[in-house]
Amino acid sequence: MVDFSLRKTRNYWKGSNSSSKQNSEVSLKNAEKKKPVTNPYANLTVPNAANLPTLDAKERNKAASSMQRRLSIHTANYTAPNLDYSMPLPSSNLIDQAMGDEQPTGKVPAINVDDEYGQRNGHSRSATPTDNETSRRPETLRPPELNRKRLGGSGSSAPSGSSRMTMVAPLNPLSPYANLFHPASLRKILSDPQFSAKKFIHERLSEASAVDIDLFTSNLTELSTDVQEEVKRNIYKSYNEIITVNNDLHEASAELKQLRSSISELTKVTDQFVTVAKSRIQMDEQQKMLHTQRPSSPQKTQSSSLLPPVSSDINGTNPKRDRTSVMILEKMWDTQLATLYKNVEGAQKHLGPASNRHLLIESSDWTELNISTQKPLQTVQLYILNDAVLVAGKTKNKQHELIVSQCCPIRDVTISTDREYRTKLMFNFGNSNTCLYETRDINECMRVLDAFRKAKDDLRDITENEKENSKRIKESLVYLQNTQQTPGREGSKSPAKRRSMGLSPSSASRPLSASMDQFILQNLSISVHSRSKSHDWSSLSHKFKLVDNLIEEVDIDLARLKFDSAVNTLLEAESQLATMKDPTKEEDAIILNVLTLKLDQRRDDILTKVTQRNLFINEIAHLREGVKTLIRLGLPEAGLDLLLQNKSNLIQELLLQVGSSEHPSLYLTELAIVRFQIIKRTVIVFRELFHRDHDKLSSILVSWCSHEVEKHFNLVSKQLLNGDKLSPDAIRYSRKQIDDLKTVGLDFVYKLDEFIKNNINKLG
């Protein structure tokens, strides 16, 4: 390629010299026109074309740029052959061995790069290669005829890529660059922390040939690719490990949060246990002190027991009521309210302070709708408290997620439901504001309704009880005040005078004017409660205080439907009140009478609630407990009345379940079995429960049984009015059931005979 380029340049400058010669000849001709010439070619000299002209630096640059342009245009014709430098060049020894030449074994053929591409000292070589040089050239640089000749004939084609690769000789292990062509050794060299690129190139590659540099470059490129792939694999592996660690950390954080909340709850429970234990230890210590003081000085103990001890009653025998559970419950309520005030902006301002306020239910996922268009307005949460209803909507404030939308006392709130859409609730806050709320869960809607109704019922009961108690206390105080003014002369008062004093013949008293009511309430507060706050530690005042505390315990037990505990506390309060002597002071006498009226009222409350709870119950065990409670309360007549009313209701319920039948005989038989068997069972229960008052109450029982038998025959008579006949089988079964009552001491055969006598014409 280089020779061809030089030849072109030489021809170019040769033509340039001839043109300059022609120009000189033209000038000579023009000069010699004036002179006659006989032979114009006589003095012609032939230029020496073998010698190239001398060029200055400018002309050389111009020629080089021209040659570069020509080579760039005709690249396809003058490009160098493609050589694969990634594999070692073939040697003449390997080719000769493939041709059949014998080579000495045990030696590795070496590649003489200097002989193939010229020595590196810059000396020029002959344009015509020798046979030895031609035999040592690579296949790609040899003429095709020589390759075919050395491979076994002129007619054979060139070998394929696979055969050429098998003919490539391995690298010489004795070469100074052998360790640079192996990835492992090159990686080891480059990974040295003290590696210097300039020093490495200066020491190791300063004497390398172009082929060695190309091989080193290819090896370095492959090593770089391997390193990049390895880096990618490591990055991907690290990414997966980071994702795994992140997931594990997320799970661990969730578990830690749950553990933190559990530990917080456990801490609260342990604190509550510690509080309960301390109060219990304190009460036990005080009880021991009272027991140790009793035998030493009985009179002193009796006088000291009149003081308000912390853990004993009047006699110092029973421990004080433990209110730790109430305290724990109040703490829970306070925590719930604090959370509500923190999450809802303006909740504390709208609700205000109140005692015993607590949260009943918190319901989310509610939507406020426009009443007219039914379009959603905002997402809200409902809070039902024991005395108020609060509705909170979403807010954009970062400190509070919710803001108060509606807040109203529960006594002024009404809720109405939609029959078609059971997930919608209409809230009427007072008399003017009405809102419509909807949820997606019908169970949540029913839960809110139940909580609201429960709060409404509890508030109504509390209000009614307070009004009733206040009314009774006022009436009793007015009555006591009037009787104390004129003792022993109540019977001599005329009806007109009684009416003028606020008393009617049918009732004990009536409330006076508003000023009088206020005076009575002040006297009650001063008499019962103020002395405990002062330093007046008289025995009678503290007895009054302890009895009043027992009455409060009765109210608590009644609210929890613990009738046995309520009866025990009531009997204890009555016994303590009975030990008190008649007070000398008029104010103490009024308080004593007020406490007596309170105890009578609690007795009536127990009677009413026990009767209401057991009047329609079908379980005999609960009925027995209710009757026993009334007997312990000293009301055996009321207990018997409860038992008989319950059995009458049971008979009526079972008879309604029997219903009418197409067979009158079967129907009358079932009626007889139901009624007479229940009568028999009632007599048995009466003997078990009222064995002490059997003689006094047996007449009431017999009267009830007789009345039930009469009701039976009256029912049969109504059945016969329809034209049915009384079969002998029905009479036989009725007689059998009546005879069965003789086992419990009742004989009503005469009533059956009387019935048959009156209906003899209807016998079938």
From Swiss-Prot:
Residues 1-47, 94-165, 287-321, 479-511 are annotated as: Disordered. It is found in: Cytoplasmic vesicle, Secretory vesicle. It comes from the Eukaryota. This is Exocyst complex component EXO84. One of its GO terms (cellular component) is exocyst. Gene3D superfamilies: Exo84p, C-terminal helical domain (1.20.58.1220), Exo84p, N-terminal helical domain (1.20.58.1210), Pleckstrin-homology domain (PH domain)/Phosphotyrosine-binding domain (PTB) (2.30.29.30). GO terms for biological process: exocyst assembly; exocyst localization; Golgi to plasma membrane transport; protein transport; spliceosomal complex assembly. Component of the exocyst complex. InterPro entries: Cullin_repeat-like_dom_sf (IPR016159), Exo84 (IPR033961), Exo84_C (IPR032403), Exo84_C_1 (IPR042561), Exo84_C_2 (IPR042560), PH-like_dom_sf (IPR011993). Involved in the secretory pathway as part of the exocyst complex which tethers secretory vesicles to the sites of exocytosis. Plays a role in both the assembly of the exocyst and the polarization of this complex to specific sites of the plasma membrane for exocytosis. Also involved in assembly of the spliceosome. Residues 289-318 have a biased composition (Polar residues). Pfam families: Exo84_C, PH_EXO84, VPS51_Exo84_N. The lineage of its organism: Eukaryota, Fungi, Dikarya, Ascomycota, Saccharomycotina.
